[in-house]
Amino acid sequence: MTASPKTRKRVLSGMRPTGKLHLGNYVGALQNWVRMQDQYECFFCVVDWHALTTDYADTSRVKENSLEVAYDFLAAGLDPEKSVIFLQSHVPEHAELHLLLSMITPLGWLERVPTYKEQRENIKDKDLGTYGFLGYPVLQSADILIYKADCVPVGEDQVAHVELTREIARRFNGFYGAAKPVFPEPQTLLTPAAKLPGTDGRKMSKSYGNTIMLADPEPVIRQKLKTMVTDPARVRRTDPGNPDVCPVGDLHKIFSDKQTMAKVNEGCRSAGIGCIECKGWAADALVKLLNPMQERRRKFEENPRLAWDILEAGTQKARKAAGETMNDVRSAMGMSLAYEAPKNAESQ
């Protein structure tokens, strides 16, 4: 089968289905994905198999959480007319390629992945001494290579995973692609990382319980902002503050317009405004951003079949591209499903 020609560079990225997404997910990835749709051929997936690498003991919420992520994908602006949006587990070719790549990937490569040691140290309440957890970077590589992605948008913490994918692609091509390389070596598209604090001032993360969710209604957003930590040096209302060391100031830099940002800078530094007023302006900016998303999200919440149909249509497109790649992989390895006469067979 001849692969479909690519007119634009192809991008692949995905998110684990941990439930509803938060502002950190939006700023760190989703916002950038939406912008990329007009420039690249985009494949975006909910990587539900990856959820099993750490949460294998309880899979009861994987499907529900996957739908929640899909709602947020669509509400934020991912367009099924511009991008292929799908569930990883519905494309079995990911698993087949993962199996084949695992045969050629040295254990040492996996053990040196920075996030492997970090997560083993940080997640103490789960047994992560499993083959699946050690090998999840190979599954991640299969996710990328199955679509012959040219580029992968990632944050700095994921650069090592893309580098591993390049090494695996290079090794596969070295073994089986002498006549013609099967896989391109994907390039990293580094996502600009804005500093987005949670309500306690640390990095916004579900594990810290400090998130503002994309689906949070306005009263919840305003309440969360009211409790958000501020410049520790500003003890009294009359004390001047510094928005450059204040988590609320960081929110303003990302979400507020220039006029509001100017008022925050002048008012905070001169003690002309209090933290309550400053937090109210930040809440205004978040509500303005999230209200349209939440209106779009409600359409899918009220009729989940709409989102499911989009995922199913995306799955068909993804399987077509993945199937073409697997034909190339099997052919290169001499394991084609089609009958091929032995090379030393005599002509009849």
Task: Give the positions of each predicted feature.
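Short alpha-helical patches at coil-to-helix transitions and adjacent helical residues
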Residues: 26-29, 94, 158-162, 248, ...
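N-terminal Rossmann-like or analogous alpha/beta NTP/dinucleotide-binding catalytic cores
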Residues: 2-12, 17-142, 294, 298
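Internal, conserved structured core segments that host functional sites
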Residues: 115-118, 123-172, 176
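Short helix-capping/linker segments at secondary-structure and domain boundaries
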Residues: 107-111, 146-153, 256-264, 294
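Non-catalytic, well-ordered alpha-helical scaffold segments
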Residues: 95-99, 136-139, 162, 245-249, ...
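Conserved nucleotide- and phosphate/pyrophosphate-binding catalytic cores
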Residues: 23, 166-348
